C-alpha cells in the first residue's frame, strides 16, 4: 500500500526540485490547478524541499545486477513482470525507475488529485534511474534460487527495486510481478497481436471501490487472483528454464532463452509487501512449490481465516513499528502452531514505506514529515530487512552461502530490531511469540 493520499502527494510535490532543479515559478503548473488551496499547499511544500537528493541503493552482494521486463501473452490475462538477475559485467546503462508517464497518471488517480499532477510527476521523476543494468546478459554457469515478489496496493512492478536488486546481487533471480487484479495504480496490456507488434498499449488503472462494495469481499477476490498470478509467473519461468520456446511480447534486447537451465527448481520462495504480504500467505496456501515466504508489513484484511491453517511452509513476518495494529497482528498469530516454523521481527523506528523505493527518492525532512521515512535511516532499515530475509532464505531453501552470519536478525537480535511485535495485545491468550518456544517477553 502507498502512504496516506495527502501525505504522499505533498511529499512528492515537495521533492520535485530535488530531481530536476529548475525555476519552479517559471514552470508554474499550479496556475492550472483550480483550487487555490491545492496551489498554496504545493507552493509552500516546494519551498520546504531539502537541497539533497536521495538515491535508490545498490545491491550489497558480489554479483552485478541486470534488469529487464517480461510479458507473456499480450492480453490482461497474461503475466507481466520485472526481472532482476545476476548479470555479466558490461556497459549497459541503469534502468528507468518508473518507465512510462501513465504510471504517474495512475499514482495521481490513486492520490485523488488532478491528472495534471501526473504530468508534473512524470516531468520531474521520469528520468530517475535505479542501479541495475538494463537488458544486461544473464551471468551463466550456475543455477539460481528464484523469488516471486508481489507489490502492494497502488504500487506496481518497479517500485521495490532496492529489495529486488539486493537479492539479485546475492545470487537470486527475482520476478517482481505487476498484478492485473485492479490493485496496481496502473498497468498495461495489448488488445491483440497487431497492437503488441506496433507497441500500442492499452492502459488500465486502479480499481476503485464502488458505493455499496464491501472492501473485505473485493480484496479477498483480488488476493486470490494475485496468488494465481504468482503461480502463473512461476509456471512460465520454469517452462523457460526447461527450454520451452516462449516469446516475450515486449520484444526487448534481452534473450529469454538465456534463462534456460538457470533456475534451481527446488529453491523457490515468495515475498511481498503490504497487500503483497497477504498475497504471500495466499500463494503459500495454494502452491507448495513455494518452499517458504516472507511477508513485509503484511496487510491481513484480504485473507479468509480458513487459509491460516493451510500454510505448512516456513513463514517470516518483517514488520514496521508504525503500521501494525492489534487486529492485524492477531490475524498473523492465527498462522502460528507448534509444528510450523514462524518468525516475526519489527524494525524499530520504521514506517510502512521503508520497504518501498519512495523512501529513497525523497529528501530527509519532507520524507520524515509525510511518513515516507521513519526515525531509522532508510538505508539501515532496508539493509536489516534484506539481511534477515537472506538468512531466512538460506535456512529454508538449503542454500550454501554465508547468509547464516545474519541468523541473529531472524530472532530480532539487533539494536534496531525487536523480536515479535511492538503492538500490545492485552489478552495474554492473544500474545504472539516469535517461535513456539520463545518467551512471552519477546512480544512487547
Swiss-Prot record:
GO process terms (BP): phosphatidylcholine catabolic process; platelet activating factor catabolic process; platelet activating factor metabolic process
Post-translational note: N-glycosylated.
Coiled coil: none
Catalysed reaction, written as an equation: a 1-O-alkyl-2-acetyl-sn-glycero-3-phosphocholine + H2O = a 1-O-alkyl-sn-glycero-3-phosphocholine + acetate + H(+); 1-O-decyl-2-acetyl-sn-glycero-3-phosphocholine + H2O = 1-O-decyl-sn-glycero-3-phosphocholine + acetate + H(+); 1-O-dodecyl-2-acetyl-sn-glycero-3-phosphocholine + H2O = 1-O-dodecyl-sn-glycero-3-phosphocholine + acetate + H(+); 1-O-tetradecyl-2-acetyl-sn-glycero-3-phosphocholine + H2O = 1-O-tetradecyl-sn-glycero-3-phosphocholine + acetate + H(+)
EC identifiers of the protein: 3.1.1.47
Pfam families: PAF-AH_p_II (PF03403)
Active site: 274 (nucleophile), 297 (charge relay system), 352 (charge relay system)
InterPro entries, alphabetized: AB_hydrolase_fold, PAF_acetylhydro_eukaryote
Any single GO CC term annotated in Swiss-Prot or TrEMBL for this entry: low-density lipoprotein particle
PROSITE patterns for this protein: LIPASE_SER
GO molecular function: 1-alkyl-2-acetylglycerophosphocholine esterase activity; calcium-independent phospholipase A2 activity
Keyword terms, alphabetized: Glycoprotein, HDL, Hydrolase, LDL, Lipid degradation, Lipid metabolism, Phospholipid degradation, Phospholipid metabolism, Secreted, Signal
Tissues with expression: Plasma.
Highest taxon listed in the record's lineage: Eukaryota
Glycan-modified residues: 60, 200, 424
Gene3D superfamilies hit by this protein: alpha/beta hydrolase
Signal peptide: 1-21
Record localization: Secreted, Extracellular space
Family statement: Belongs to the AB hydrolase superfamily. Lipase family.
Job description of the protein: Lipoprotein-associated calcium-independent phospholipase A2 involved in phospholipid catabolism during inflammatory and oxidative stress response. At the lipid-aqueous interface, hydrolyzes the ester bond of fatty acyl group attached at sn-2 position of phospholipids (phospholipase A2 activity). Specifically targets phospholipids with a short-chain fatty acyl group at sn-2 position. Can hydrolyze phospholipids with long fatty acyl chains, only if they carry oxidized functional groups.
Full protein name: Platelet-activating factor acetylhydrolase
Organism for this UniProt entry: Canis lupus familiaris (Dog)
